Amino acid sequence: MALVTCHRDDAILGQSTNISEFKDEWEDLQREIDHYNTIIKWDEMWDIETAKRWLKRGDRLFLFKQENKIQGWIWVFTTKEFRHLYVNPQYRNVKNARDLISTAGYIVSKNWAKWWAHIDDWNLGAWWVARGIGWKKVIDFHDN
């Protein structure tokens, strides 16, 4: 696992028309969560109740949409952590992942100078995307 950070002065920020902040789209969010759970088995996957708690405490959810349907997301927590990046496999590519991260970064950069994330060792694709838009690796750490 690696700790990565991004400073707004180093970031490649953008605004994609396919990215928006969550606005009470609970039914569509549940649909994509259900799809996620059929293709990925992950113990830390959140559900609607967790999403409601996170949003209530001030965390933000940014959505990737295609054909007016949620097809991906990234959470940005009040701790300045970017977390839970996901793009539906049908739409998974560097551009869509980059758009999610850079659009969320653009929005939070208005209030924050720096933000961070963890990237798992197996997720080299996420690291390539993040590095390509200005994120820097701070430290690698491993379980063993």
Question: Where in the sequence are the language-model features?
Answer:
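Glycine-/small-residue-rich active-site loops that bind phosphorylated ligands and cofactors
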Residues: 92-93, 122
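A conserved beta-strand-loop-helix scaffold within acyl/acetyltransferase catalytic domains
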Residues: 42-89
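Conserved acetyl-CoA-binding loop-helix of GNAT-fold acetyltransferases
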Residues: 87, 93-106, 127-128, 132
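Conserved GNAT acetyl-CoA-binding A-motif
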Residues: 108-120
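Acyl-donor-binding surface of acyltransferase catalytic domains
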Residues: 1-23, 127, 139-144
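Catalytic phosphate/metal-binding cores of nucleic-acid and nucleotide-processing enzymes, i.e., regions
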Residues: 79, 112, 138-143
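Conserved active-site alpha-helix within GNAT-family acetyltransferase domains
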Residues: 121-139
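Short amphipathic alpha-helix that is part of the acyltransferase structural core
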Residues: 12-46
